[in-house]
């Protein structure tokens, strides 16, 4: 019985799972919008939201803590410079998960994960 066991395994080893979410969080911070499967998106929220909370208070200790969890200098820099100030007054709920239908190959439920309050750039429509 797996009572009180939180988190999904995704049929991966713990190291593979940790690396996968580390890379997904770094990609989310860099691009502010990623597409993944719905279960991975829900689990990514448990990794990314505490990192954004850490990014709200800039300091050497917090930067080192974030780097230990992300292992990506560019993502950590953006986390503290841009995202930390953007969400300084928001008490949580930094991510939005939008369902995006089902994948063609295996019918897996897909979702977009985006940072709320991200600047939306209007794309020019070719006539």
Curated annotation (Swiss-Prot):
The keyword Metal-binding does not apply. HAMAP family: Ribosomal_bL17. One of its GO terms (molecular function) is structural constituent of ribosome. NCBIfam families: L17 (TIGR00059). Belongs to the bacterial ribosomal protein bL17 family. It comes from the Bacteria. This is Large ribosomal subunit protein bL17. GO terms for biological process: translation. It holds the Pfam family Ribosomal_L17. Keywords: Ribonucleoprotein, Ribosomal protein. Part of the 50S ribosomal subunit. Contacts protein L32. GO terms for cellular component: cytosolic large ribosomal subunit. It comes from Xanthomonas oryzae pv. oryzae (strain KACC10331 / KXO85).
């Amino acid at each position: 019985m797996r009572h009180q066991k939180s988190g999904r395994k995704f049929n991966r080893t713990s190291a593979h799972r940790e690396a996968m979410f580390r890379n997904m969080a770094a990609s989310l911070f860099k691009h502010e919008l990623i597409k993944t499967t719905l279960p991975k998106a829900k689990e990514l929220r448990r990794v990314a939201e505490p990192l954004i909370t850490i990014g709200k208070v800039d300091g050497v200790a917090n930067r080192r803590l974030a780097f230990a969890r992300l292992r990506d200098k560019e993502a950590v820099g953006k986390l503290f410079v841009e995202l930390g100030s953007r969400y300084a007054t928001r008490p949580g709920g930094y991510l939005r998960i939008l369902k995006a239908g089902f994948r063609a190959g295996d019918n897996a439920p897909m979702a977009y994960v985006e940072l709320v309050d991200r600047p939306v750039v209007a794309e020019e429509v070719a006539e």
